[in-house]
Amino acid sequence: MASIQDIQALEERIYDAVQEYLDNPDGYENAVLRVYLDEDDMIHRAEIDNNLQGTEDDGIYAIESLIREGDDGPEVDNDRASDIANSWIFLD
């Protein structure tokens, strides 16, 4: 049974992954965000991967789609992170 807390937890995982990328963009080559359900513990995960091919239907998101220009430079697009989390987890 999914809850709003599950959605918020995935939003935070997405935010953290994209922020990790923003903190060290040179550490990645062709970076994408990968969202998936870890079947071992049934928790949705979000991580940055290199050179991974796929579409949003596969859980692969262009990193640029999660970054917006803020007052102090590039930052995580929280609205986009929320949209992605809500597309993965549905409330019962």
Regions found by a protein language model. Give the residues of each.
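Negatively charged, low-complexity tracts enriched in Asp/Glu with abundant Ser/Thr
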Residues: A2-D26
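Polar low-complexity intrinsically disordered regions
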Residues: M1-Q5, E69-D72
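Short acidic DE-rich linear segments
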Residues: I89-D92
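Acidic, low-complexity, intrinsically disordered interaction modules
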Residues: P25-I84
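Charged/polar, solvent-exposed surface patches and flexible loops
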Residues: E12, D16, E20, S65, ...
